[in-house]
Amino acid sequence: MENETFGTELPDTWVGRIDGDNPEHALWYTTVSPLPEPDEVEEGVVTLGFASDEGNLRNHGTAGAALGPDAIRGVLGLVAVHDARPRYDAGTIRVGGDLERGHDELSDAVETIARAGHLPIVLGGGHEAGFGSHRGIYRARGSSPAIINLDAHLDLRAAERPTNGTPFRQVRELVGEEFRYSVLGVSVPNNTDFLFNAAREFGTEVTTDDEINAMSPQEAADHALALVRDAEHIHLTVDIDVLSEALAPGTGSPAAVGVELGRIRAICTGLAATGRLTLVDVVEVNPRLDHNNQTARVAARLIHEIAEAHLKAT
């Protein structure tokens, strides 16, 4: 595993164009900065790559999500920026076959970023990122943030080794009774009774894809906000397979139905606008399965809107 975090140069997958030197020409590509010393710069948002296929492979899935962080950066760089708040990139953790070490590196990086007052935005990579990132914020904050998981799957599997299906069972084992977990967009046919029983045992709030799709975007956002109304801090984790395969084909476990994008956008920006986000993951983007970077573009749009709303609120 090659650690490429907290360097003095940006990853070379940040690409774009330069239309001019004035702020009115700003793009992510022209505004994002490397982050060698997180505690010596103005507070902002920090993208951090977690290039991991190992969780998918252990779960008998398809490789390719390790390419997700670079694919997301490649399209996020072209997105226009309409504020002067700082955006940083802390590099990429490249996992290889040692997921446990990857989790350690991710937890350490997230803790460092959060202690310096920034919002970490983890780019995946498999959803195994959710455990490593949450453990890092748990250490930084001294408590476990409420988790909102936008996902077709409950991710509460029991397994001998961590996979992309076990992250939130691992979080439950870590934080115990502090565990506060809500999953929105669940596909009932893609989760066994064992998983639903685990969700009930752990007090998980479950909202299905059909239930979210029956709401307006504003109702969906209000529903998510109600779940964390009294939470001081929020961990928003977005598995791109919460969306329909027609919109997000580049993922290892695509959804036949999925949640309509407008509702996911409303939930993400509604949560970000509270100013209480403490951690964000956007995961399971697999460029090998994508069409013309379609899924990476959707992920980049969500990341941009989350960052913009959070920076405006803080």
UniProtKB/Swiss-Prot annotation:
Please tell me where Mn(2+) 2 binds in this chain: 151, 153, 239, 241
- Give the top-level enzyme category: hydrolase
Q: Which GO terms describe its biological process?
A: L-histidine catabolic process to glutamate and formamide; L-histidine catabolic process to glutamate and formate; putrescine biosynthetic process from arginine, via agmatine
Which parts of the sequence bind Mn(2+) 1? 127, 151, 155, 239
Described purpose of this protein according to its UniProt entry? Catalyzes the conversion of N-formimidoyl-L-glutamate to L-glutamate and formamide.
Q: Which cofactor does it need?
A: Mn(2+)
Q: Which HAMAP family match?
A: Formimidoylglutam
This protein's source sits in the domain of life called Bacteria
This entry's Gene Ontology molecular function terms read:
agmatinase activity; formimidoylglutamase activity; manganese ion binding
Q: What is the similarity comment for this entry?
A: Belongs to the arginase family.
Kindly state which keywords UniProt assigns to this record, in alphabetical order: Histidine metabolism, Hydrolase, Manganese, Metal-binding
Comment on bound cofactor: Binds 2 manganese ions per subunit.
Q: Please list the reactions this protein catalyses.
A: N-formimidoyl-L-glutamate + H2O = formamide + L-glutamate
Source organism per UniProt: Corynebacterium efficiens (strain DSM 44549 / YS-314 / AJ 12310 / JCM 11189 / NBRC 100395)
Name of the encoding gene? hutG
EC numbers on record? 3.5.3.8
Protein name per its UniProtKB record: Formimidoylglutamase
Q: Hey, which pathway is this one from? A: Amino-acid degradation; L-histidine degradation into L-glutamate; L-glutamate from N-formimidoyl-L-glutamate (hydrolase route): step 1/1
